[in-house]
């Protein structure tokens, strides 16, 4: 019989137990052996068979022990009692069926009474309670009333119920007080078995002690009864539990509410509860913190029950017992411990574990969300496979709780009671919160949370479904199956035996009620609703702010609840009712917690952390707002709720946290708006990534590929910004689309894709997928974005869905694994220290949830519109439907193009709030989302339905149009025209195609929502139908339900869509009410500061719309644009506030200026501008300088360049305001901006002679005509140029002066202040700040181009400027030489080069005019200006010490003082510290190890520049430009040209073998090559020899020096061939050789006479004599010598001994000779003359006086090939001893040739290449810009003004990389002076007919560092359009409507300031080309100054010359030198034709 036989004598023991002869003790011993060694099945059988024997043995022994205990009571007896009770327990456990039949009823009852006696020790009493409960469990309904009464008295401390015998206590029940008479039989009095011992521990709180025991034993003994029918175990628990509820609960929970039901929940929001009275009960032993309690009765009991109930739903590990609080460390009786095989011991160990675990884990968390605790509810996964045998106690208990509605309601109600506990019991509340959290978060819900079903599935249906898990089944099916799986246990229970047990209270229900009672599925939504309501009680308890511990606990609890709310908001699918419940509760909670009187609020200011409100403000606002947004994405939220939100939030604006959260929300909503309406990702904008985009390009159909790389912002507060891809939109949609096979097919397609994509997200749970969305990538990039290249269609709704998924799936799976959201339960239950992390978790969702609906359709729904049947008529009548006075509204959301095409003006100033969303019917077709009209709209259809609406439905209030300037929360409702059509196709209703041919996003019409419609039978126009329903090629028409629109528009599509995003953005923007009503100035300022940021984002969106993504085509203008002026009503109103709100006002002014200085897509209307100008007028004249500063700062520089209608009305205000800024003492004022504004106005007065403008001295609006605007501007600019303390501002002022001077000179206004302006510029040349001085120098440099006009204005001005430059250099030189700063030296160099240009611009005649110094010490000698020039240059070369010698001193500044010029005008010094120069060169600071080079360079900077100027003047003054034209500065001739000894085309070593060439060095600075070449014959006019007799060879001298290369040909002249007789004296004539024909007439400013070519010699001179005066041309009265001397003086003025005085005028007598001495000399000469005469007369005929007659010599041909060269050198004195030191030979080697070639390749002028682009209207990409072949007339005129056209094929000047082979064009503009060459790479001049030529063109243009862009496009030009690493400076020219030109300069930050044009300048067309050219040249110079070790052309040339001289000079003796000069190389014969 017994299978387990470790004990050899089990059988024997069995027999001995049954042996009646044995004594009771022996039988007991053997009974124990049997119990301990038998299997439980065998044991049960044994007990069943021999129950009588067993009970007898037990009872006998019990009686014995009882007697001995009363006698002795030793410990041994107590242990024996334990052993006996062990047997007793086994009897109760193994014989439940018999006991149920009341077997041994009284005997057992008596024993239990003895154990329960209140006189026993606590341990025995507790053991009695345990056994009593076992007995009751077996008896169940067969017990008597007495047992139930005893049960009701088991726990002391509860008030005893009354009976006829007095109060019914336990003592009374054990020993009833019977009123017996003495004669009657009395019952034996029951006495205690084991009274308390002296060492026993007492219990303070017996109620808690026994309550905990009772609750513990009710549960852990459920399974210990070995019933044959296992269902009796559940019944036993149910029986005890129902009586516990009956007898104890009314006391423990006096306010328990029976009506509360999960099935018919009462969802009224609770009221605020007052703060309980907390008292300290003790201090914590460890932390010493006070522990508080409230003195409520039974509060502890309440906590115990709650914790007990919680323990069934929270288990630390699977299969462990529940934690029963208070049982820690308890030791159970030894018999239980010993019975290893028994169930009891198992349970004991379980309890110990549970206790330990719970104690340790309460502060921490089970970090697993996959715990099986709650998975063991009845469900297919567990119960189909688990036998009833193996159910744990807890599972049984849970089954009971889940068996019928009343029990479920009980659990719910107790949990509600938990939320009503005082905060000192937070630990219990935490556990309840944890339970709810697990229920909400875990996959498998408790049965009552599963969805109710109508169909009952019998148990026989279950097996086939049991383990189905198929991820590919559709969402709905999957969910249904899940629910089916969950039902089988319930059905099992129901079908087998629940019906029998009906009710344990004895009330029998009829069948239908019972069925209802047992159908416990309430569904998740009901549980969520009840939880939301009940948990709100925690918030609605008045906080104990004064007790820190309790405040911490309260905060912690609130945050835990909020965390669950947040989880629900983000992750849980909720229905409309639940959402509304959530929002209502959050609203009330927010209001109740945070609303407080202002006094109370101020009291806690700065101590917010000491109040619950202060701590919760941020989390509450965040949760409320995010929940609100998520709700609107999922269900339709009524207008009333929105109104509530508005009223609550607008009343809480004194919370800074609200402003912060609102700003964060708006930031995210703006991103969402960008994504869904404009298809832009703000974190990855096209403009930010145009360079990388080319590689990333998708080739797919319209896929918005811009959103591929997206960072995931893990924050809850942004979590709503992306749709949840899986939020079962299809399921919601199916309500309207069931039945259509196409629908089902489409739905399954979408679902599969959705599941595939999202499977990997968050946690690996198949069914959760639809509630999650973590990925930034999912929805949006696939659906939300339109391809950047295509115009934004009027609706972005589409059904084009399959394509993107294949691309996205792999990526999403990969990336999202790393973004899984950790389960939110991980922190709950932890101490409040963990809560911040939780909040982060919660916040972790804020940016993450992706497009739910997007997963179903790309950006669906703006097209989801409802269309009235009379649509076509409405379209036709559009123009007639507008009321006369309606301003009409193409708002900023419309396309600029379409707005422009109508005569309407924007609604910015519309009386009802300047709503930028307004539309009248006329414009709906341009609007992406329906009737968000500024007039009316219904929240149901906010964005999608243009149907007729009743008055109640005019949902404008606070939601769509905001009426942001209205004080009230609701907005005015206006009449709404019934004829409104919201159309989504194009106006012709034809499909819209993108330029790339990809499928356009076409809209679909929405569900026609009958509730809101009067016309139900709508027919779509056929054509419209096609456009609206256009579907992609790969889906049939039927595959997508076409009637869907967003829930917000009354449809079924959830998630973000264009209309939803728009409406949500609008509503949230205005959710604070009128922001100008915010009382706290700081918060007001904070809000306005954020509005600035918000506007920036909108502006960014606008800038990124219509951007070419491939840079090959320009997209058409966007149809929808952001409402940049939407904020203006708030801003306008803010400017009217008091000074208390100053900071906010400043932000408002700033934003007004920023808004209005942008290019306006939609021109503002008259009313708006009137309001705007009024505000600006008041602001500019405001007494508060900060306001003036703000306006000036943010209006500059573009304000006047926009050409706003009537903007010139503000000119006077701006001049006055800018003047105020300039004259203020504050350095941080917007000084530069003020100067830029003033500078932009200098050209206006000449355009507008009389300017109507607001009067700046009157605050009222009064328009006056101003004629003195010019005077006012120039007065302000002049004073700024003198006194401005800020360096950059002073520079701008000087530039403005320069521009103004040019403007006045061009208009020939002869303005008197030009002199003063020139004076200021000239005085600034010596300003201490070198940057300012440099700018002044640049201005003078620019004026060189206006010399002729200056001479007209004031003839002596140019000469005066040269004198000023000379005097300034003289003044600066000594200090500069001593300075170690390179900037100082660079300034003098700039002045020298400026001086050179001025000298070259004036005719020689002017320069030679005598200069009369005004200085007192001046000697009486006259000197010419040229003389002074050379003196100052000499000083610069040899050092300022030269000036100490009066002979070498040029002139001082004081010499120049005059009425017009004050050289010592006072200039205020700058207040800002100068940038610290290091003595090192700025240009070379990047390369440290080059100090020596730098110092050398620095020391020589001025000297080299001065030498260059000198050589330049010597070579070019009076000669440039020569016949070759300005492009030719230096000779192109080389040593090999015309050389018969050299056959090579370039310099080659054979030259060294030539006998006719020699190379010399002169003065160590100049290279001279002498070559003897053949003379040319038969030249017209005689060629070089001018027809005179000459030798057959000429001498060519090629000179290379600092300023270039020059070639001189010389011939020896013998005389005229016809004349014989005396030979003519030998003479040489030098001339320039080989000049080419001029390409262009020379453009020198000198007025030259005709060029006379005489005998082939080109001469330019001022006509004085026709020819050289010869004997045959002289008239009789003329003196030949006189004429010759005059001729020489004119043609060679350098020969004049005295400036300006002809050579034939006798010189005055020397000063040192007196008249007497003069007479003596004359007499001596006359005497000598007389004596000589007499001698001749006397000896004339002497033979000795007569000479032999000479014959003419016979000519000899020289034999040497170098003869004439050495003859010339000899004549020039080069062979003399005194020249020996300065004249040397060069070594002849290949290196020399290489150096010479290199030297010749260097430029001899400064060169610049500058790109010029033409941008036509609408061009935004490089391709269309580069393919322009011409431009507008204004552009062509401008290009013509930059220079003159040169033919590239024969251009001999600087080419700038252009080719002569016509591949880079035929002609190009070119400009040159003798010092500068500029070539313009004009894009319209270069060919663009092939890809190759385009590439070449881009290469040329792109490599230029300065770009000039002429833009006629409506948008500002962007740097990135022409992709290049160069283009460091962009000078962009925008033609304005008033024929002026606005200049925008974009430069890299490191580029130093340059002028004359500055960013924001506005100039006249007449000065534009010269100004732009000068600016481009200065920009190019500024860029070159940044290059480390950069050298100017002359520095480079000087270095090359120096290198050649150093390395190739050959020192020789005189003999060797003479030999080399005599014969450069040995030769054997002359060339064959040498003797011609």
UniProtKB/Swiss-Prot annotation:
Tissue specificity: Widely expressed.
UniProt main location, coarse: cytoplasm
One protein family per Pfam: Rap_GAP
Spans annotated as Minimal domain that binds to TCF3/E12: 1327-2035
Biased amino acid composition, Polar residues: 366-384, 486-497, 850-863, 983-1009
Residue positions where Phosphothreonine is found in the record: 754, 778, 1002
Coiled-coil region(s): 1716-1744
Modification Phosphoserine occurs at: 711, 721, 773, 797, 860-861, 864, 986, 990, 994, 1000, 1004, 1478
Gene3D superfamilies given in the database record: Rap/Ran-GAP
Record field: compositional bias (Low complexity): 895-910
Any GO CC annotation of this UniProt entry: cytoplasm
Rap-GAP domain sequence ranges: 1796-2004
Keywords linked to the UniProt accession: Coiled coil, Cytoplasm, Disease variant, GTPase activation, Nucleus, Phosphoprotein
Region (Disordered): 343-384, 476-497, 715-753, 849-910, 982-1009
Biased composition (Basic and acidic residues): 345-365
InterPro entries the UniProt entry points to: ARM-type_fold (IPR016024), Rap/Ran-GAP_sf (IPR035974), Rap/Ran_GAP_dom (IPR000331), RGPA/RALGAPB_N (IPR046859), Tuberin/Ral-act_asu (IPR027107)
Compartments, as annotated in UniProt: Cytoplasm; Nucleus
Medical condition linked: Neurodevelopmental disorder with hypotonia, neonatal respiratory insufficiency, and thermodysregulation: An autosomal recessive disorder characterized by profound neurodevelopmental disability, muscular hypotonia, feeding abnormalities, recurrent fever episodes, infantile spasms, and moderate dysmorphic facial features. Brain imaging shows thin corpus or dysplastic corpus callosum, and additional unspecific abnormalities including gray matter heterotopias, ectopic posterior pituitary, signal abnormalities in basal ganglia, and stratum subependymale.
Quaternary state and interactors: Component of the heterodimeric RalGAP1 complex with RALGAPB. Heterodimerization is required for activity. Interacts with the HLH region of TCF3/isoform E12.
Function: Catalytic subunit of the heterodimeric RalGAP1 complex which acts as a GTPase activator for the Ras-like small GTPases RALA and RALB.
Name of the protein described by the UniProt record: Ral GTPase-activating protein subunit alpha-1
Provenance organism: Homo sapiens (Human)
Gene that this polypeptide is encoded by: RALGAPA1
